[in-house]
């Protein structure tokens, strides 16, 4: 989840959902690059673990960590050297190397923000339009619950795989309880004009490393038009 402050002082808040290797980090990093002329601030509210709470019929998003556990391959060239003095490196000489680094303040993650977009990261399908918005709960839930992606070597999986709600930690073990929450929250999204859709990161396609730029460019266009 990231919070963007545009140069016209509007705030846009986006959640990307997808399992490991779906292209979430790559797309957000690409957005940081293409949006530099239009965005004055980009704050990470949560990297992996976030919470959505509905209180008095108002939904807010909160983070649960002030750091990130990310793949070094997902970061811009040279970034790891910039944070060398405040980061923890894991298996830096191997593939799928990881780094733990601080990305947000405690105030950032605990204030609670409204959400404008909730997008599923699709890394395996080609699409001329890089963002597809759903017009009903059923269509959205079908995609989000399926949790499909092509494994990118970040886990032990290979090929096209599915994980219930793109999360092996919780939803899979408590599917019945998760379904109750998904029905409630997705209904809230559509009832309150929160845009729910799919963003085609293309990370598992040919020339995958270049594709998130196209997805980020289309996302920026939509943010500017809103």
Regions found by a protein language model. Give the residues of each.
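An acidic- and aromatic-residue-enriched active-site/binding cleft used to recognize and process polar
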Residues: 7, 19-21, 33, 47-50, ...
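Short, surface-exposed amphipathic charged segments that create phosphate/polyanion-binding patches used
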Residues: 8-9, 58-61, 211-219
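Glycine-rich phosphate-binding P-loop
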Residues: 9-36
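Hydrophobic/aromatic beta-strand patches that form the interior of the parallel beta-sheet core
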Residues: 14, 43-45, 62, 117-119, ...
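Flexible loop/turn segments at secondary-structure boundaries
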Residues: 22-25, 51-54, 69-70, 125-128, ...
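Conserved nucleotide-sensing/catalytic segment adjacent to the nucleotide-binding pocket
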Residues: 39-108
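Conserved NTP phosphate-binding and transfer environment spanning the P-loop NTPase/kinase superfamily
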Residues: 93-226
């Amino acid at each position: 989840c990231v919070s963007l402050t545009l140069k016209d002082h509007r705030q846009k808040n986006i959640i990307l959902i997808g399992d490991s290797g779906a292209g979430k980090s790559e797309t957000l990093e690409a957005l940081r690059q293409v949006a530099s002329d239009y965005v004055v601030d980009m704050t990470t509210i949560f990297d992996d673990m976030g919470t959505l709470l509905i209180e008095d019929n108002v939904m807010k998003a909160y983070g649960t960590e002030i750091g990130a556990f990310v793949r070094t391959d997902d970061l811009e060239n040279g970034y790891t050297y910039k944070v060398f003095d405040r980061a923890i490196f894991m298996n830096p000489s191997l593939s799928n190397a990881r780094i733990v680094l601080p990305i947000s303040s405690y105030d950032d993650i605990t204030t609670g923000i409204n959400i404008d977009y909730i997008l599923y990261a699709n890394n395996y399908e080609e699409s001329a339009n890089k963002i597809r918005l759903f017009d009903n709960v059923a269509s959205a839930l079908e995609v989000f619950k399926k949790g499909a992606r092509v494994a990118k070597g970040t886990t032990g999986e290979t090929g096209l795989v599915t994980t219930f709600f793109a999360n092996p930690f919780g939803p899979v073990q408590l599917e019945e309880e998760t379904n109750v929450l998904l029905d409630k929250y997705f209904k809230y999204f559509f009832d309150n004009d929160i845009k729910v859709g799919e963003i085609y990161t293309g990370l598992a396609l040919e020339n995958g490393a270049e594709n998130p730029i196209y997805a980020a460019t289309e996302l920026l266009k939509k943010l500017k038009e809103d």
